[in-house]
From Swiss-Prot:
Any one of the GO CC terms: cytoplasm
Binding site for substrate: S8, K40, T72, R86
Classification via Pfam families: CTP_transf_like
Organism of this sequence: Gloeobacter violaceus (strain ATCC 29082 / PCC 7421)
GO term, biological process aspect, one: coenzyme A biosynthetic process
Binding-site residues, ATP: S8, F9, H16, G87, L88, R89, E97, H122, S123, F124, L125, S126, S127, S128
Name of the protein in question: Phosphopantetheine adenylyltransferase
Cofactor: Mg(2+)
Pathway(s) served: Cofactor biosynthesis; coenzyme A biosynthesis; CoA from (R)-pantothenate: step 4/5
Reaction catalysed by this enzyme: (R)-4'-phosphopantetheine + ATP + H(+) = 3'-dephospho-CoA + diphosphate
Subcellular location: Cytoplasm
Length: 161
């Protein structure tokens, strides 16, 4: 069975990676789909995020990474994915995620949404938090893989504090 894990991943955190690694044990194939959203200005380009994630998951043979735009269910259908994966950090995530799952269900009744709770040690993480801390010169090595930490440091080098 194929599972699709969509998101912006700007940047990928250890929380995201935890979900990907656990999903890789549950499914035959996991596709990490990086959102290309022209309405948002990301810190990293789609190409940079694809590269970051590919490097982080290279130890997982059944995980692929690709970019997408448009409806998630359209991508899922194209890939023949029957499951959309979503990570939940806290109860506060649930309401928005449930609404999205119900919306996706109305668009594609054959596709299920599976919620995986983030491991406790990563439950506080978000890409926004990582960017804010990195922008202020704070440590993020416990939040993101080393290669992403280096890219964050480079991106924010010389940024005003």
């Amino acid at each position: 069975m194929i599972a699709l894990y969509p998101g912006s991943f700007d940047p990928l955190t250890y929380g995201h990676l935890d979900i990907i690694e656990r999903a890789a044990r549950l499914f035959d194939r996991v596709v990490v789909a990086v959102l290309r959203n022209p309405a948002k200005v990301p810190l990293f380009t789609v190409e940079e995020r694809l590269s970051q994630i590919q490097k982080a998951v290279r130890h997982l043979d059944n995980v692929e990474v690709e970019a997408f735009h448009g409806l998630t269910v359209t991508v899922a259908r194209r890939l023949d994915a029957r499951v959309l994966l979503r990570g939940l950090r806290a109860v506060s995530d649930f309401e928005a995620e449930l609404q999205m799952a119900q919306t996706n269900r109305t668009l594609a009744t054959e596709i299920e949404t599976l919620f995986l709770s983030t491991s406790t040690e990563h439950s506080f993480l978000s890409s926004s938090l990582v960017k804010n801390i990195a922008a202020a010169g704070g440590p993020v090595s416990h939040m993101v893989p080393e290669h992403i930490e280096k890219e964050l440091r480079t991106r924010f080098a010389g940024a005003p504090l």
